């Protein structure tokens, strides 16, 4: 019986990795050559120390009607702190100069962070003129923007998403940068930022438990109701006092009130773009079928 179970498991694994298995069978020399090379280089050049998830633009939004206290900011800060503690001051290999260097994680944030160093975010010139900081070639810059919709919907930032900034954002992987943002709703953020966003986390909070659902931004962009979309992944974590005390948003609120003059309603709506949700724009036929099925159920 055990042998049969093991055989079934083995067959399922082969089916799941069928494309890779087929390539390995027909190209064994090339396949196993690079398996050996990559495993060797992983340890030889300490690749486990490198932070390689730069180039990712991540948005945290509220779930359902829980616009406030949904865990958006604390989820963003949790990820940033994890990255800093895991990868800062780690020895990594620079393939261009062929030497080992110390990797530094530089955080540029409009949220006051406690316990880790950061550069205060004052304007989008910090995206365009990042070279002025003289970061090393193996250093990583992480931008942290809480309430990004409120920040970019101000007159001071009216023309901020310029071609230079857009170029920087699109080339963030080459520049070893990544961007974390929060917004009460995805559509509250400028349409340009929404279009280049990589993943959206919808957050909900009960007591100290925070539940996250990861979505493809394009699915949320064109869906009437996020509930019809199956999330790419889900996760649950618990907030302790250390996490609560790791940041302070009071200064952010004060800065928003003092420094930024809101745009008019017409200007804000223009920055959101022509938001016309349509089931025809959903990214897969599965989503369309799910939507149509729910509509039929409601009509019964």
What is the predicted function of each stretch?
Residues 1-8:
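Feature marks short, highly hydrophobic, charge-poor N-terminal signal-anchor/signal peptide-like helices
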Residues 15-54:
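N-terminal pre-Walker A segment at the start of P-loop NTPase domains
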Residues 50-59, 87-100:
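Phosphate-binding P-loop
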Residues 57-90:
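Glycine-rich P-loop/Walker A and Walker A-like loops and their local beta1-loop-alpha1 context
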Residues 104, 139-142, 175-181:
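Loop/turn-to-beta-strand initiation segments
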Residues 112-171:
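Conserved nucleotide-sensing/catalytic segment adjacent to the nucleotide-binding pocket
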Residues 213-300:
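Conserved P-loop NTPase motor module
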């Amino acid at each position: 019986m055990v042998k049969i179970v093991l055989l079934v498991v083995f067959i399922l694994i082969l089916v799941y990795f069928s494309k890779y298995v087929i390539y390995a069978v027909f190209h064994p020399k090339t396949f196993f050559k690079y398996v050996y090379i990559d495993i060797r280089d992983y340890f030889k050049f300490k690749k486990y120390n490198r932070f390689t998830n730069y180039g990712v633009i991540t948005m945290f939004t509220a779930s359902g009607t829980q616009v406030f206290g949904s865990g958006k900011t604390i989820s963003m800060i949790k990820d940033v702190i994890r990255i800093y503690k895991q990868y800062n001051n780690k020895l990594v290999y620079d393939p261009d100069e062929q030497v080992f260097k110390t990797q530094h994680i530089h955080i540029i944030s409009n949220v006051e962070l406690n316990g880790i160093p950061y550069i205060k975010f004052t304007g989008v010139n910090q995206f365009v003129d990042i070279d002025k900081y003289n970061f090393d070639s193996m250093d990583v810059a992480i931008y942290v923007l809480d309430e990004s919709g409120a920040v970019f919907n101000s007159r001071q930032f009216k023309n901020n998403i310029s071609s230079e900034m857009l170029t920087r954002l699109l080339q963030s992987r080459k520049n070893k940068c990544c961007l974390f943002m929060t917004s009460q709703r995805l559509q509250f953020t400028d349409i340009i930022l929404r279009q280049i966003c990589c993943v959206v986390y919808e957050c909900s909070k009960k007591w100290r438990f925070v539940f996250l659902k990861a979505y493809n931004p394009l699915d949320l962009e064109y869906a009437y109701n996020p509930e019809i979309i199956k999330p790419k992944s889900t996760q649950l974590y618990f907030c302790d006092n250390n996490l609560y005390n790791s940041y302070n948003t009071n200064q952010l609120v004060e800065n928003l009130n003092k420094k930024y003059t809101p745009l008019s309603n017409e200007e804000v709506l223009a920055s959101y773009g022509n938001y016309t949700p349509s089931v025809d724009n959903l990214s897969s036929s599965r989503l369309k079928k799910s939507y149509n099925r729910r509509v039929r159920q409601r009509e019964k």
